Amino acid sequence: MKIFTLPSASPKQTIIQDFGLGKISISYSRPSLSGRSVFGNNSILAPLGKLWRTGADNATLITFSDNVTIGNKLIEASTYSIFTIPGKETWEIILNKSIRGIAAYKEEDDVVRITVPVQENLLNKETFTINIQQIQYESCAIQLGWANVMVEFSVNTNIVERLHKSYEKQLASESKPHFQAAAFYFVLGNDNHKALNEVTIALQSNPRAYYMHYLKCNIEMAIGDLEAATLSVQKTLEAAVAAGSDDYKRLAEDIIAKL
């Protein structure tokens, strides 16, 4: 006979997000209001000015698999507790080395402490929610939302310098990732001419690669060579149609309409 147990009133959730050259994972328990007050002077849940575990039950944990920066401070790859001190206008966001929960909290174990403004929560109001949003190559925002309140803090990383060194080393080896290097130099490496050279070499061994022609077209437009870009986008369209790629067909047609 299968034995069932009562589900937790604050079910646990773990979110994992690729970020930069690593990952961010957050594990926390999600309390619901259930008619109770929160973020007030004498509220039942998370009263103003009091240290909060930022969730329920055990410590809310955040793990970075790669070094990041929060509040201009380097945070080494590791697992930390997230504590907060809610306020009416601002919150204190705290990352702490101890992962044993709020009862074991010591201020001297704080790794970083930042102040962030309170915003209006337009998402889930009943159940406490943590999201990772606004994801860019080197930055993202971690959002905490409950009731009518939302706060967020930025997480930053540095990938450009490491990618530059990596691609320079790979291009000097026997295995040369020309297309990947071209994409890097165009998107992040701030070297359109080197990007154009690398994608041109890549196309020599794969002339039907519509995605390579598409990248080449965008690089040529950025450089200002519209004549070459027109030729490249036509090749993108032809190769995309031949390969059955409707997405790249639409992308090519959109550029053709603008050139």
Explain the meaning of each model-derived region.
Residues 218-223, 244-259:
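TPR/TPR-like alpha-solenoid helical repeat scaffolds
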Residues 57-171:
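Long, contiguous interaction/recruitment modules in multidomain scaffold/adaptor proteins
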Residues 40-53, 95-106, 174-175:
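Short, solvent-exposed cationic patches
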Residues 1, 182, 258-259:
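Short, solvent-exposed mixed-charge patches
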Residues 2-59:
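Start-of-domain marker
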Residues 164-220, 224-228, 238-239:
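Alpha-helical adaptor scaffolds
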